[in-house]
Amino acid sequence: MTAEDFLTGQILLIDKPLHWTSFQAVNKMKWALKSKLGLKKIKIGHAGTLDPLASGLLLVCTGKATKQIAELQGQAKEYTGTFYIGATTPSFDLETEIDESFLTSHITEQLIYKTVEQFLGEIDQKPPIFSAIKKDGKRLYEHARAGETVEIAFRKTTIYEFEITRIDLPEVNFRIKCSKGTYIRSIANDFGKAMDSGSHLTALRRTKIGDYDVANAIDVLAFVDPLENAK
């Protein structure tokens, strides 16, 4: 693609690596477009943040395609990942250490499959304290790191599909299709509670946004390197 193509507008499917922030991925691409294609100014942004501890599909829009970001953000998302049953963390994932352990001797495959049914359709979900949502002028994670207790309101979200793909306790693998604004970390935490135990998220990968599939995505560096020859 040429510089003009990117200015006209492209929707780029990027497979975000684990431990990268979404901002880092977009920034790397923006730097490459400006420095390697000689673009002094170009609009670029992504249609939905992925946590550093998650990998997978990031839709990056350039030029006039940035006008589609809001529409793309509103599309259903699909994820695969792993719950660790029997322990919780304050962040609901591996960002923080285990803070409490729970019994799992009563948990059977039948209970796991039955619990899934409670999460299908429209549900009330409380976002994690370790999230970027603003409360009283600060991000929730800023309150959390300062040791402050804040009241977090429930939000409506919709789970379209929830499939258990592997059970090997304490690990449970899943596939979830959900609406915009769903926190899979919160589902992990709530899933454990629903079984009178605890749970946290140990792996997460976004596989789809609407009809866009990570199978058709490329790595950030695989995007950057060919630009050397694109002038």
Q: Where are the model-predicted features located?
A:
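Catalytic/RNA-binding core of pseudouridine synthases
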Residues: 1-231
